[in-house]
Swiss-Prot record:
Gene3D superfamilies the record matches: Photosystem I PsaA/PsaB (1.20.1130.10)
Binding site for chlorophyll a: M683, Y691
Record carries keyword Zinc: no
Annotated PANTHER family: OUTER MEMBRANE PROTEIN, OMPA-RELATED, PHOTOSYSTEM I P700 CHLOROPHYLL A APOPROTEIN A1-RELATED
Gene: psaA
InterPro entries reported in the protein's UniProt record: PSI_PsaA, PSI_PsaA/B, PSI_PsaA/B_CS, PSI_PsaA/B_sf
Catalytically driven reaction(s): reduced [plastocyanin] + hnu + oxidized [2Fe-2S]-[ferredoxin] = oxidized [plastocyanin] + reduced [2Fe-2S]-[ferredoxin]
One GO location term (cellular component): chloroplast thylakoid membrane
Protein name according to UniProt: Photosystem I P700 chlorophyll a apoprotein A1
Subunit composition and interactions: The PsaA/B heterodimer binds the P700 chlorophyll special pair and subsequent electron acceptors. PSI consists of a core antenna complex that captures photons, and an electron transfer chain that converts photonic excitation into a charge separation. The eukaryotic PSI reaction center is composed of at least 11 subunits.
Enzyme nomenclature, EC number: 1.97.1.12
NCBIfam families, per database record: psaA
MF-aspect GO terms: 4 iron, 4 sulfur cluster binding; chlorophyll binding; electron transfer activity; magnesium ion binding; oxidoreductase activity
Organism: Pinus koraiensis
Residue intervals passing through the bilayer: 70-93, 156-179, 195-219, 291-309, 346-369, 385-411, 433-455, 531-549, 589-610, 664-686, 724-744
Length: 750
């Protein structure tokens, strides 16, 4: 790989007109590879084309050129995101009942899709209330729009148009920064400038501008909506921004302007920057004054953080110095050499970022229900379930991606000669201890967690309920989790001044919030059933980590294949004539890791779905009696495998199975079709390549007989291609099956 040394002084360095814009070249399939550009001889060509189109490492060894391609591709990605967002806002403007929902969010369900009657599928347009017929949506956009202060469909139109303009700008920027003014390598490697700009600009000013919007637009509009003012009567956003008196009527401290700020009398602003905790009883969402305060505080932190790193002014941190000074008593050279890795290997950089982003996505999933950020989100059970499930799946995929890119770094970018006795080298040298210990943990967790269930199933089958692990027999209470819950529940009053409730109602205490006779949130009790399933979570997560980590640590070499690095990231076996060396590539570990990730996330979303229906979601009577959707059956039913099958999977599948002839019938078809896609994957996963090659040759013979033989020779999928197609269909089929099962159920009963 060609690497140029960075210049000491930070300058904005670009190369003018480095690559000619050529539609002729662009239109030629495989132009990035000499072999592929020749065109297809066999059907393998189309697979290789897809596999390598975005593998910029394989196009060139010049790190600068690779960096420019990645940078340009990011603008393309942003353009796609803006187009997608524009579509969402356009649907809200053109096909939705947003204004009706805004006027009565407790009785009207959100819908932003109306099916056209072509072959009778207008049956899918269910009655969502207020005389509107359409498909009920569960994306949470309506709640987000209300929190943003959007009060009309015209505003959604304008935002949709704005997003398209931004998409066009992004497409232009992607072209411009590759073809017209491409940054030099030194610019991509200038980490201090990058940190300063990303922290202060992206996160600092980004949070500050959102806080400004919340304070000047969202808060006053939501205050009036909560008070029952008709959305059409509420002043438009620009009126609040331009007319301070309007704001001062709602938040008196606005009349004082910036005087309290400069006189350090900040508590004057506590009418719109609060620290209450808990939920707004009108909307069942977080107090928007709390979230405005939060974004302002985050902005201050990141604006400070964005001034910490040394650039042209001789003050501030230097990342290389920080890393090289980081030595512990047992870590040898510590982080020495990591700076060079992270400035020359974008795979290493990406692996760390994906690991953190994936974890953060899963944290988001857990906060969306425990601290619902938007008005009326908490009583829209379909949206709650969808947001949790979506963020869990996405987080799982991103974490597997982290392992994939870590392994690619090991194979393609790692240079053992420059890494001696630093942390990475030391981890690699005791990888056998790491993997064997992790394997022991997996076996322990697997046998013990599953064993508890098997014990319960056996006792239940023998009619001995008194000998089961349950809240009413042999208790296994999650005492540590309960201790954490109690600590948080009793925290308000002794922690932040003015906090009247804990961060989340789920911690405990006597509070419950109901909106429109539906439960928004209440304290979530944890018992033996949760203790059991949490150990299944521990087991599946540890196995996923074992597979992925083994793939990374043994990506370059192993006792079985000492020269594995020479074989590349993905290979089927170590050549012919060496048995028992198949499925050992780093790619194969990612492949296997995906199945265990799927296992792990499935158990999590099943646990969440049943627990919430059993112990949280439900309705409240005029006398204050709460009736949960499944009547609190989680604690006693989920402690056996049979209970999971009978009272969760089978009992709750009745809605999707019986959906034909109703507005939910699309979910019934998806449920059926996705089962088929899942089963189809097994044909690829349990296949032998030779079997298909023989079959193909018979079929080609028949075509030759009829003189209709193709010019491009058909070939069976390679082993790796077959596994890739298999895992893709396995995951797609499994996830869509779950999606249809969850939504048909929760829309029918929620």
């Amino acid at each position: 790989m060609i690497i140029r040394s960075p210049k000491p002084e930070v300058k904005i360095v670009v190369e003018r007109d480095p690559v000619k814009t050529s539609f002729e070249k662009w239109a030629k399939p495989g132009h990035f590879s000499k072999t592929l550009a020749k065109g297809p001889d066999t059907t393998t060509w189309i697979w290789n084309l897809h596999a390598d189109a975005h593998d910029f490492d394989s196009h060139t060894k010049d790190l600068e050129e690779i960096s420019r391609k990645v940078f340009s591709a990011h603008f393309g990605q942003l353009a796609i995101i803006f187009i997608w967002l524009s579509g969402m806002y356009f649907h809200g403007a053109r096909f939705s009942n947003y204004e009706a929902w805004l006027a009565d969010p407790t009785h009207i369900k959100p819908s932003a899709q109306v099916v056209w009657p072509i072959v009778g599928q207008e049956i899918l347009n269910g009655d969502v209330g207020g005389g509107f017929r359409g498909i009920q949506i569960t994306s949470g956009f309506f709640q987000l729009w209300r929190a943003s202060g959007i009060t009309s469909e015209l505003q959604l139109y304008c935002t949709a148009i704005g997003a398209l303009i931004f998409a066009a700008l992004m497409l232009f920027a992607g072209w411009f920064h590759y073809h017209k003014a491409a940054p030099e390598l030194a610019w991509f490697q200038d980490v201090e400038s990058m940190l300063n700009h990303h922290l202060a600009g992206l996160l600092g000013l980004g949070s500050l501008s959102w806080a400004g919007h919340q304070i000047h637009v969202s808060l006053p509009i939501n205050q009036l909506l909560d008070a029952g003012v008709d959305p059409k009567e509420i002043p438009l956003p620009h009126e609040f921004i331009l007319n301070r008196d309007l704001l001062a009527q709602l938040y008196p401290s606005f009349a004082k302007g910036l005087t309290p700020f400069f006189t350090l009398n900040w508590s004057e602003y506590s009418d719109f920057l609060t620290f209450r905790g808990g939920l707004n009883p009108v909307t069942g969402g977080l107090w928007l004054t709390d979230t405005a305060h939060h974004h302002l505080a985050i902005a201050v932190l990141f604006l400070i953080a964005g001034h910490m790193y040394k650039t042209n002014w001789r003050i501030g941190h230097n990342l290389k110095d920080i890393l090289e000074a980081h030595k512990g008593p047992f870590t040898g050279e510590g982080h020495k050499g990591l700076y060079e890795i992270l400035t020359t290997s974008w795979h290493a950089q990406l692996a760390i970022n994906l690991a953190m982003l994936g974890s953060l996505t899963i944290i988001v999933a857990h906060h969306m229900y425990s601290m619902p950020p938007y008005p009326y989100l908490a009583i829209d059970y379909g949206t709650q379930l969808s947001l949790f499930t979506h963020h869990m799946w996405i987080g799982g995929f991103i974490i597997v991606g982290a392992a994939a890119h870590a392994a690619i770094f090991m194979v393609r970018d790692y240079d053992p000669t420059t890494q001696y006795n630093n942390l990475l080298d030391r981890v690699l040298r005791h990888r056998d201890a790491i993997v064997s210990h992790l394997n022991w943990v997996c076996i322990f967790l697997g046998f013990h967690s599953f064993g508890l269930y098997i014990h319960n199933d056996t006792m239940s089958a023998l009619g001995r309920p008194q000998d089961m692990f349950s809240d009413t027999a042999i208790q296994l209470q999650p005492i540590f989790a309960q201790w954490i819950q109690n600590t948080h529940a009793s925290a308000p009053g002794s922690t932040a001044p003015g906090a009247t409730a804990s961060t989340s109602l789920t911690w405990g205490g006597g509070d419950l919030v109901t909106v429109g006779s539906k439960v928004a949130l209440l304290p979530i009790p944890l018992g033996t059933a949760d203790f059991l399933v949490h150990h299944i979570h521990a087991f599946t997560i540890h196995v996923t980590v074992l597979i992925l980590l083994k793939g990374v640590l043994f990506a370059r070499s192993s006792r079985l294949i000492p020269d594995k690095a020479n074989l590349g990231f993905r290979f089927p076996c170590d050549g012919p004539g060496r048995g028992g060396t198949c499925q050992v590539s780093a790619w194969d570990h990612v492949f296997l890791g995906l199945f265990w990730m799927y296992n792990a996330i499935s158990v999590v979303i099943f646990h969440f779905s049943w627990k919430m229906q059993s112990d949280v979601w439900g309705s409240i009577s005029d006398q204050g009696v709460v009736t949960h959707i499944t009547g609190g059956n989680f604690a006693q039913s989920s402690i056996t495998i049979n209970g999971w099958l009978r009272d969760f999977l089978w009992a709750q599948a009745s809605q999707v199975i019986q959906s034909y002839g109703s507005s939910l019938s699309a979910y019934g078809l998806l449920f059926l079709g996705a089962h088929f896609v899942w089963a189809f994957s097994l044909m690829f996963l349990f296949s032998g390549r030779g079997y298909w090659q023989e079959l193909i040759e018979s079929i080609v013979w028949a075509h030759n007989k009829l003189k209709v033989a193709p010019a491009i020779q058909p070939r069976a999928l390679s082993i790796v291609q077959g596994r890739a197609v298999g895992v893709a269909h396995y995951l797609l089929g499994g996830i869509v099956t779950t999606w249809a099962f969850f939504l048909a159920r929760i829309i029918a009963v929620g």
